[in-house]
């Protein structure tokens, strides 16, 4: 199958998933933990979840960029969400994972403490973002999801990084291939 056909097929599947969500009034999320909080991102932005592997540090990279890693022959910039959210540092554990996401036509990895689950959340259970949550900039948030006694912080991946930061991470990855 050609790349064009694959791309068209993926776009058709993406539209189908979005239409399904509109019809079912649910949002499908990948949820994970960073520090003591549980976060969620839209499943359509997640490419895959991998184990934390060797990371190569890059000189003069932004402080929240942990470095780069090899993902099947491609250079993957890796961001530590703890650093991005100005949370206390913690050693990575066997539960630590890298959530590989697509943001603005760029693929990057997000280090998280643990994966919780893939879930469907009713849109009626999602509230707008509060002004501040434990030091996290409210611009990073799409909202708060309530499910039973759980609160999920729903991240807006398109706003977690400025255009300049995305450009810088692209340069880090592009310059290393």
Language model segments and positions:
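An acidic, low-aromatic, low-complexity terminal/linker signal
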Residues: 1-177
């Amino acid at each position: 199958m050609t790349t064009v056909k694959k791309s068209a097929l993926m776009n058709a599947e993406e539209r189908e998933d979005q239409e399904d969500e509109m019809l079912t009034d649910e949002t499908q999320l990948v949820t994970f933990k960073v520090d003591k909080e549980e976060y969620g991102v839209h499943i359509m932005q997640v490419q895959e979840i991998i184990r934390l592997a060797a990371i190569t540090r890059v000189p003069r990279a932004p402080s929240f960029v942990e470095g780069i890693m090899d993902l099947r022959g491609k250079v993957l910039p890796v961001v530590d969400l703890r650093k991005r959210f100005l949370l206390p540092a913690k050693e990575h554990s066997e539960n630590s994972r890298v959530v590989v996401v697509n943001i603005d036509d760029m693929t990057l990895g997000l280090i998280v403490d643990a994966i919780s689950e893939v879930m469907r959340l009713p849109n009626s259970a999602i509230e707008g973002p509060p002004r501040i949550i434990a030091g996290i900039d409210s611009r990073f948030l799409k909202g708060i999801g309530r499910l039973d006694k759980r609160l999920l912080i729903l991240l807006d991946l398109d706003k977690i990084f400025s255009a300049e930061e995305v450009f810088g991470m692209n340069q880090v990855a592009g310059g290393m291939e």
